[in-house]
């Protein structure tokens, strides 16, 4: 996800996306621990970075409301 796409979202949409990505990350990590080979091992890193991006922009929006 690009930061510009995230900035267009409202706080509720950002929260939903964070939850969705965290569930997907847990699923991918579970597959990895069970020994299943991942189709694309970069998925875990990308998910973590997307979550961090979402949290950062969420925090920016909350601070700007003050």
UniProtKB/Swiss-Prot annotation:
One of its GO terms (biological process) is translation. GO terms for cellular component: ribonucleoprotein complex; ribosome. SUPFAM superfamilies: Ribosomal protein L29 (L29p) (SSF46561). The keyword Ribosomal protein applies. Signal peptide: none annotated. The keyword Thylakoid does not apply. Keywords: Ribonucleoprotein, Ribosomal protein. InterPro entries: Ribosomal_uL29, Ribosomal_uL29_CS, Ribosomal_uL29_sf. It comes from the Archaea. This is Large ribosomal subunit protein uL29. It comes from Thermococcus sibiricus (strain DSM 12597 / MM 739). The gene is rpl29.
């Amino acid at each position: 996800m690009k930061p510009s796409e995230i900035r267009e979202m409202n706080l509720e949409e950002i929260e939903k996306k964070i939850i969705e990505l965290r569930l997907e990350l847990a699923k991918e990590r579970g597959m990895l621990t069970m020994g299943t080979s991942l189709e694309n091992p970069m998925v875990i890193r990308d998910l973590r970075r997307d979550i961090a991006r979402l949290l950062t922009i969420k925090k920016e929006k909350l601070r700007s409301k003050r």
